[in-house]
């Protein structure tokens, strides 16, 4: 049986590995900018100007990277 592809994890992992600057839009419209330093099933660790923020995924609306991210869809 073929493994299902987890696009979210691939996307976040590429952002983390490539140190891609990203803008996070929260559900309340607030924007956070920085680098993804880590993530798990429920949270994303964002670093901005040397300070870390742990954001719950259920509060995030959109990830907008500064450049396109290459991920494997097959």
Curated annotation (Swiss-Prot):
GO terms for molecular function: RNA binding. The gene is hfq. HAMAP family: Hfq. It comes from the Bacteria. Belongs to the Hfq family. GO terms for biological process: regulation of DNA-templated transcription; regulation of RNA stability; regulation of translation, ncRNA-mediated. This is RNA-binding protein Hfq. NCBIfam families: Hfq, PRK00395.1. Homohexamer. Disulfide bonds: none annotated. Keywords: RNA-binding, Stress response. RNA chaperone that binds small regulatory RNA (sRNAs) and mRNAs to facilitate mRNA translational regulation in response to envelope stress, environmental stress and changes in metabolite concentrations. Also binds with high specificity to tRNAs. PANTHER family: RNA-BINDING PROTEIN HFQ. Residues 9-69 form the Sm domain.
